[in-house]
A protein has these predicted regions:
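Active-site-proximal beta-strand/loop segments in catalytic clefts of secreted hydrolases
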Residues: 38-42, 79-84, 104-108, 138-143, ...
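Loop/turn elements at helix/coil->beta-strand transitions in domains of secreted/extracellular proteins
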Residues: 31-34, 71-75, 97-101, 107, ...
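Hydrophobic membrane-insertion alpha-helices, especially the h-region
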Residues: 1-9
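Oxyanion-hole/transition-state-stabilizing segment in secreted/luminal serine hydrolases
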Residues: 84-120, 140-143
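Active-site segments of SGNH/GDSL-like serine hydrolases
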Residues: 107-108, 126-154
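Stable alpha-helical elements in mature extracytoplasmic
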Residues: 56, 60, 85, 89, ...
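Serine-esterase "nucleophile elbow" of acetyl-processing enzymes
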Residues: 10-79, 90-97
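Catalytic His-Asp segment of secreted/periplasmic serine-dependent ester chemistry enzymes
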Residues: 143-227
Length: 227
C-alpha cells in the first residue's frame, strides 16, 4: 500500500510549476465562463502552487479551451495537490465564487480504502465552500491496478451527482479501453494521464463547462449551490 500511495502523489508527473496563461486573469471585454477546481495530482500535475495559479504541463486545466478558437473558459481559483484525498481538499480549499466548481477527486481515497459514504460527505463539504451555480463532478481516470474499484467508484459519483442536483461528466471516458484500463499512450504509469491524456480529459471537461453549465447558470441565478 505504501508504494502505491506514493505513486498516487507526484511520482512520474512533470515538476514544472509553470503558470497557466489565463490563470486567475479574465481578459476584459470578453465573456468567459469561470471555474474553480478541487483535485489531486491529476489536476495539479506536479505543481504545489495550484492555489496561486500554477499547474503542471499534464494538467487537464490547460486544455479546457479548444485550440485555435477564442478562449471561453477561465480558471479563477481552487486547490489541488498530489496525494490529496477528498478530505484534504475539503480542508484546504478556500472560499470563492465562480460560474462552476469542477471536482475531480477520489483516486487517493480509493488507495487509502476510504468508503464511498465518507468520500461523498467530503465532496458535499467541498461544494459548500465555493459559491457556484454549477458543480461539475468528473469521473476519475482509470487505475490499471484497481480496475473494479475505479469502475464502481465512478458509478457512485454518477449517482451521487444526480442525488445532489450536480452535473456529472464522464470526462475520463476517452482515456479508457474496453478493459477499463488506460488506452495505450495516454498514461506513463497507469494512474495519471500524461500530456496526451490530459488533453482528452481537459477537452471533455471543457465541453461540459460550455454546454450544460451555461444553461444551468441561467436557470439558477442567485440560487445557493447544493451542498
Amino acid at each position: 500500500m505504501a508504494v502505491f500511495v506514493g505513486l498516487l502523489g507526484l511520482s512520474g508527473m512533470p515538476r514544472a510549476d509553470e503558470p497557466l496563461p489565463q490563470a486567475f486573469a479574465v481578459p476584459a471585454g470578453v465573456n468567459h465562463n469561470t471555474f474553480m477546481v478541487a483535485g489531486d495530482s491529476i489536476t495539479a500535475a506536479g505543481s504545489r502552487k495550484v492555489a496561486v495559479g500554477h499547474v503542471g504541463e499534464a494538467s487537464w486545466v490547460r486544455y479546457v479551451n479548444t485550440p485555435g478558437t477564442p478562449a471561453t473558459l477561465a480558471w479563477t481559483g481552487g486547490w489541488a495537490l498530489g496525494g490529496a484525498q477528498s478530505g484534504d481538499m475539503a480542508v484546504a480549499l478556500r472560499a470563492g465564487s465562480a460560474d462552476s466548481l469542477v471536482i475531480l477527486a477520489g483516486t487517493n481515497d480509493l488507495a487509502h480504502g476510504n468508503s464511498h459514504t465518507m468520500i461523498g460527505e467530503n465532496l458535499a463539504r467541498i461544494a459548500r465552500i465555493v459559491r457556484a451555480p454549477m458543480v461539475l463532478l468528473s469521473s476519475i481516470p482509470p487505475r490499471d491496478d484497481a480496475v473494479a474499484a475505479t469502475v464502481a467508484y465512478n458509478e457512485f459519483l454518477k449517482t451521487f451527482a444526480g442525488e445532489r442536483g450536480w452535473t456529472y461528466v464522464d470526462a475520463s471516458a476517452g482515456l479508457r479501453s474496453e478493459a477499463n484500463t488506460f488506452i495505450e499512450g495516454l498514461s506513463d504509469d497507469g494512474v495519471h494521464p500524461n500530456v496526451e491524456g490530459a488533453k482528452i480529459l481537459g477537452a471533455a471537461i471543457g465541453q461540459a463547462l460550455t454546454t450544460k453549465p451555461m444553461q444551468a447558470i441561467a436557470d439558477t441565478a442567485g440560487v445557493e449551490p447544493l451542498g
